Amino acid sequence: MNCHVGTKDMKIRKILFGLIFVLICSVGCGPEPAVDLFSNEETSTEQVAEIEHDSTREKYNKGSCKRLTDSPYVLVIFVDDEESSWDTIAVSNYWYENVIPAMAYIEDQANGYGISLSMETGSYATDTSREMSVKYDGIISNYTGDAKATEDLLEQCAVSLGFEDEYQMHEYLQSHTGKEQIVYMIAVNKPGRSYCMSTASNSEYLEHCVLYTVYPTNKVENSMCVAHEFFHLFGAEDLYDPYGKQPRRAELAKEFYPDDIMFRRDEDVYQLSVGSFTAYTLGWTDEMPEECNRQDWWE
């Protein structure tokens, strides 16, 4: 299989990448995806009509993760850096305690809105027996206040795996899996505040999540965090006002969506739900909830 990307195309993509406005909310021709390590080979059985993008859900149908009405391929990259690493046991524990429950939860929530998702999953991780190394050259920052803190993380992961860059890896995965949408979730085995790198522009930017295993307060992260960041990739918005810009929306969310996964945390992800506004931002429904059709929700 030839996955070569032309030099001219590469330069154009690099220029486009530099012009993209990224929003932080708070992922031979190269090795085979490690679907043999952890995989779910089921495929989507149902699709719903595409919903057009509009100004009330500005990141829906944008970037590389456009619609959560089509089952995407989910790739978890377990990356090492100069101060942290993954071993086989840690990878296995994170996979079965966080990733698998999160994917099941997302599929269950989608089903409640009449959306049938059956997501295929795979992973990359350092494997000395296969001479595979997933390594970031340097220290992965856990500071989410700077949009450039980990802007080269996905690229470095791709290069360490033998690809020319993240775009070649993306094209390879699309070809290998037959999926247009690839969800990148980069897991880092150290404390930090997990976040999502997403875009509201029509661009080639490869949206992705950065997931830390431990919250800055030393609280171990769980499947709720994985699902929360996953939803961000497809347009879901925080309802708890993390940046102090929409205090009124947070008040209204507490009244109307107290158990929404985009509003609060919980040790048990099934104590949380996808409320009607979050479903709207994901494109699971095209009807704006009445309680959100008010001026102070948007101020």
Region spans (language model):
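Bacterial N-terminal signal peptides
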Residues: 18-26
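Active-site-proximal segment of zinc-dependent metalloprotease catalytic domains
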Residues: 58-69, 83-84, 148-243
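Bacterial N-terminal signal peptides that target proteins for export
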Residues: 9-16
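Sec-dependent signal peptide cleavage junction
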Residues: 27-41
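Propeptide-to-catalytic entry region of secreted or membrane-anchored zinc metalloproteases
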Residues: 48-176
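Intrinsically disordered, low-complexity serine/threonine-rich repeat tracts
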Residues: 39-49
